[in-house]
């Protein structure tokens, strides 16, 4: 099974507001960069989308080390998701899980691979995490410009 390192990040201008996600995928000495964004979103949604998009970009099952600076993603995937699934994607107090459709998509994407999750401190000089952050900001930029243009009208 191929081994892939993935570094993800999300960014948002306002929360909610225009947002973007970025991911760096590395297999040996081959590197792929991805980014995207949405006009009206949250930072947490962008963090989730970065991980989902990166895992879905892998064409075959892989051994994956996925690095994120999001405690929300780390806690959700390692602590909370088991209870949510058991409760039909409801929280302990029977409310629908926030961003439930994205958590379900991440769960499905993860199930195709053998993923080990790693938390990295954001904005601490980790080169791949910094690059994922740059890609997230790049993914957000077109939506940020449109948001500013709408504000001037």
From Swiss-Prot:
Binding-site list for Mg(2+) 1: 9, 47, 69
UniProt subcellular location: Cytoplasm
BP GO terms, sorted: DNA replication, removal of RNA primer
Enzyme class: hydrolase
Note accompanying the cofactor annotation: Binds 1 Mg(2+) ion per subunit. May bind a second metal ion at a regulatory site, or after substrate binding.
Metal-binding found in the keyword field: yes
A GO MF term: RNA-DNA hybrid ribonuclease activity
GO cellular component, one term: cytoplasm
Entry-linked SUPFAM superfamilies: Ribonuclease H-like
Catalytic activity: Endonucleolytic cleavage to 5'-phosphomonoester
InterPro entries cross-referenced by the UniProt entry: RNase_H (IPR050092), RNaseH-like_sf (IPR012337), RNaseH_domain (IPR002156), RNaseH_sf (IPR036397), RNaseHI (IPR022892)
Coiled coil location: none
Assigned keywords, A-Z: Cytoplasm, Endonuclease, Hydrolase, Magnesium, Metal-binding, Nuclease
A Pfam family reported for this protein in Swiss-Prot or TrEMBL: RNase_H
Cofactor(s) for this UniProt protein: Mg(2+)
Binding-site residues, Mg(2+) 2: 9, 133
UniProt-listed Enzyme Commission number(s): 3.1.26.4
Domain RNase H type-1: 1-141
Function: Endonuclease that specifically degrades the RNA of RNA-DNA hybrids.
NCBIfam families: PRK00203.1
Subunit structure: Monomer.
Family: Belongs to the RNase H family.
Name of protein: Ribonuclease H
Organism: Sinorhizobium medicae (strain WSM419)
